[in-house]
Amino acid sequence: MNVTIIGGSGLIGTKLAPLLERAGHRVTPASPSQGVNTLTGEGLAQALAGADVVVDVSNSPSFEEQAVMQFFRTSTANLLAAEQAAGVRHHVALSVVGADRLADSGYMRAKVAQEALITGGKVPYTIVRATQFFEFLRAIAGDGAAPRVSSALFQPMAADDVAQFLASVVPQDPRNGIVEVGGPQRLPMNEAVQRAFDAHGDARRVVADAQALYFGSLLNDRSLVTSAGAQFDAITLDAWLANAGTPGAR
């Protein structure tokens, strides 16, 4: 298959491309640094020429509420129109577990808007909702000396396993629906962040706070965990911290 990866220079895109190539697919990475801009449409037609499948793992460069909404609405609309013109047979999009449960978050509302464009479009699709990545655990806490982090349960996973799951979806028939994938463990967010701090030599102590916000939203124990029927990866947080070293090393 010919596969175009939108967001091909990012964390997931750079992990996904070699997996697809080893499986025998022809891969075209596409991102602004490679001359493809989904916001303006620049380079899209060329990047999608001959593509059977498009995998969209792109992300907004800004998390500001209006900017992130504009990014996902505009880029997704442009991408779907270009795919239809190019005869793409399967649109695979990476989204977020819990996006539809966190209406107070501008970022999550933008992801829901992206999903709505896909489900309302004419290109057959599969939406993959994944949980938060191990690689971003420390970023959740920010730079404070004693960061306050939600004590709600969540279910993080390795970016490598997100890429592996996406690679398994590519050759399948479009589901025209949503599938969820998450880590093998549910644990309090503050505990996961503290483990990441400890493993990386960060001496800060995380303060568990049930009122701490996540992307602008208050969490409960169902907000960020997978639903019934979800897929699960096998790498636990402790195993990832022991083997990955610094984020991005895997």
Annotate the PLM regions.
Residues 125-126, 139-157, 161:
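A conserved pocket-lining segment of Rossmann-fold NAD(P)-dependent short-chain dehydrogenase/reductase
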Residues 1-23:
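N-terminal Rossmann NAD(P)H-binding glycine-rich loop of SDR-like oxidoreductase domains
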Residues 135-144, 169-179, 202-204:
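Glycine/proline-rich active-site loop of Rossmann-fold NAD(P)-dependent oxidoreductases
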Residues 22-86, 97-103:
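NAD(P)H-binding glycine-rich loop region in Rossmannoid oxidoreductase-like domains
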Residues 15, 19, 82, 117, ...:
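Rossmann-fold NAD(P)-dependent oxidoreductase module
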Residues 193-250:
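Mobile cap/lid helix-loop segments that border enzyme active or cofactor-binding sites
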Residues 87-90, 95-101, 113-136:
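Conserved beta-loop-beta element that borders a ligand/cofactor-binding pocket
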Residues 153-160, 181-195:
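Substrate-binding strand-loop-helix patch
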